[in-house]
């Protein structure tokens, strides 16, 4: 594992660091918007007094703190999408890979980083028996993950049941209902926190008890970017039919759904996705700062 000079320096000087994933850049956003947004994420982290650590695998080397040039190279190298399970494969086969929530959380934790910002976690898909690695990884990795909950394409109730079963503490930032996007809030109740200091305190108490699971901080999408639920559900039904007809499954499902949602919504879901990501990065910075108090 290679830790960049800026991240290593921040670790040595005990500065707040926020980990960022590469899958949303390589597979979640279209080119060239993805590279522009990646830079904006890092700028937000710096502006909030923290150090960004974008994580990915470049030609078999795990990198914590990808440079702008390395990120461009990663995107251009047709990277595979890897969860924790596939990290060793990517390394051994000298593959370039974009890291998902599970693999980013694992690598960040191994590097000593305590806070990670993402868009949404993977969960339990509707219909077929498809459960994301993210939940399993969060059950055994000591990190705070800030997300906008999970995508409305998932089975929200079952996702929360899995999080509970695997002892992943899930808290809502200024809400007692689990967020989903692009609809803001579900009807499923969770614990509520009011500020970053409370989240940091919960994490510190958890560590005193040597509980190794993550804390999932669910941060609702800003209200101005919420999309109509009926509209989104209509798109999802159309896409689910396409997925069945084309026999798309496994890791290919989510990227396909996100791409088609952007197309069917005329770009509205893409705009919402970028806004919620930036919103999560800002909250992650506040939490990282609070952990240093």
UniProtKB/Swiss-Prot annotation:
Pfam families: Indigoidine_A. It is an enzyme of class 4 (lyase). The active site is at 21 (proton donor), 151 (nucleophile). InterPro entries: Indigdn_synthA-like, PsuG. It catalyses: D-ribose 5-phosphate + uracil = psi-UMP + H2O. Keywords: Glycosidase, Hydrolase, Lyase, Manganese, Metal-binding. GO terms for cellular component: cytoplasm. One of its GO terms (biological process) is nucleobase catabolic process. Substrate binds at residues 81, 101, 132-134. Its cofactor is Mn(2+). Its EC number is 4.2.1.70. Mn(2+) binds at residue 130. Belongs to the pseudouridine-5'-phosphate glycosidase family. This is Pseudouridine-5'-phosphate glycosidase. It comes from Thermosipho africanus (strain TCF52B).
